[in-house]
């Protein structure tokens, strides 16, 4: 089980991913911190995401958060969130982080708030959904597709005619 946590701030500061394992779902072993905010893509937090086992490898997809210093609202400008990926053969040691969807490639009608990738395999292709906030303060889901877990193409955006929350996430 991976979980998002802020080990240095009880009010939810800098986010990391912790990791527990279990053989029987009754007894759990803490494996330590799996993902750190240690790259230029996620220096202000490793936000939530999902894992996928495919071809004997574990793939983690998550949101990297970067806040630019300055006088910004951090809704429409001043924040860069990218979808990041690592893989592992043992679930403990992970590859270097790679950016699979950069913040510049998200649709222009969205704010800086796009996050929390959920990835699965469907009919020999991979699907991803991300929660987002439209500039009109309306929540939406972005649906992506990939053949290789690295090159993602936007398929569609899902929302409701009426406002049903200003941000859809997790």
Protein language model features and the residues they cover:
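Beta-rich carbohydrate-recognition and catalytic domains
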Residues: 1-116, 120-170
